[in-house]
């Protein structure tokens, strides 16, 4: 019997941490199961995956690709050229690497790579993170072997026979966050036993959330609440002056497990990764959907929870006036905290990564027969 060749897998996508970290979680789970597997990432040149993926121990190729700007921009004139150039480079990558499967996790690079893989006869799989599918994934769904989703009723967008309900991949240290509870407050320079609000706006930051907190810091201090405030890299320099004994300001948090462990209430954008992590840790949260995303998918993500009393939602336009007031209200209301915590846990899928990897190898092994 001939020796089976190592599995060769391409994972494509990125642009934000919300796409990159789930992709790395999938890669890590594949490596844990089959250590000799060869994994290649394909991302967008100049985006954060070009640093984060090598830091996680994987090789990555970059495509000259970006999204269409909503405002009139010279960059938009180059978009068709970028798509064509990226497609042909993706074809070359696929033909050289010869993958058993190509996985798209969303982000600019996902579309040309999966199109190239489909055209080359390579099996493909989409991991759709949001409750509202984007244009690219809807177009790709016609040819992929499977679509791993995190929300119900995705038959609105995809062929029902291809949908696999897996949940979104989350890093193992987040799933095991309770192990990091001891010493979590002191890790961030905060005091145990004091009501703690954790504010996060994603790796790049959220202007409206930051403005809302900045305007109302005195109210939070006067209420006896301490704050861990993750500003994002674009806003940190202008906000670091507020760092104090009870307000800890940071641009980025690597130890999200500890941040979740010590938080009583969390304020967050409503990206798919954030919601998946919040569901697993089961902490009461207030979601402020970003209005600057395709198809307004963050609002749809947030509504999926708020309609089930699994989160509170504050519209971005209302956040400067309402967000901190809502946070103070929730910090004082133990019954509301309990209800939100109980309901958001029903959305948790701690085994999502393993479910996705199971489907990946089911497809590969079927094709290898």
From Swiss-Prot:
GO terms for cellular component: plasma membrane. This is UDP-N-acetylglucosamine--N-acetylmuramyl-(pentapeptide) pyrophosphoryl-undecaprenol N-acetylglucosamine transferase. Signal peptide: none annotated. Pfam families: Glyco_tran_28_C, Glyco_transf_28. It is a peripheral membrane protein. It comes from the Bacteria. It catalyses: di-trans,octa-cis-undecaprenyl diphospho-N-acetyl-alpha-D-muramoyl-L-alanyl-D-glutamyl-meso-2,6-diaminopimeloyl-D-alanyl-D-alanine + UDP-N-acetyl-alpha-D-glucosamine = di-trans,octa-cis-undecaprenyl diphospho-[N-acetyl-alpha-D-glucosaminyl-(1->4)]-N-acetyl-alpha-D-muramoyl-L-alanyl-D-glutamyl-meso-2,6-diaminopimeloyl-D-alanyl-D-alanine + UDP + H(+). Its EC number is 2.4.1.227. UDP-N-acetyl-alpha-D-glucosamine binds at residues 16-18, 130, 171, 203, 253, 298. Cell wall formation. Catalyzes the transfer of a GlcNAc subunit on undecaprenyl-pyrophosphoryl-MurNAc-pentapeptide (lipid intermediate I) to form undecaprenyl-pyrophosphoryl-MurNAc-(pentapeptide)GlcNAc (lipid intermediate II). Disulfide bonds: none annotated. One of its GO terms (molecular function) is undecaprenyldiphospho-muramoylpentapeptide beta-N-acetylglucosaminyltransferase activity. Keywords: Cell cycle, Cell division, Cell inner membrane, Cell membrane, Cell shape, Cell wall biogenesis/degradation, Glycosyltransferase, Membrane, Peptidoglycan synthesis, Transferase. One of its GO terms (biological process) is cell division. It comes from Cytophaga hutchinsonii (strain ATCC 33406 / DSM 1761 / CIP 103989 / NBRC 15051 / NCIMB 9469 / D465).
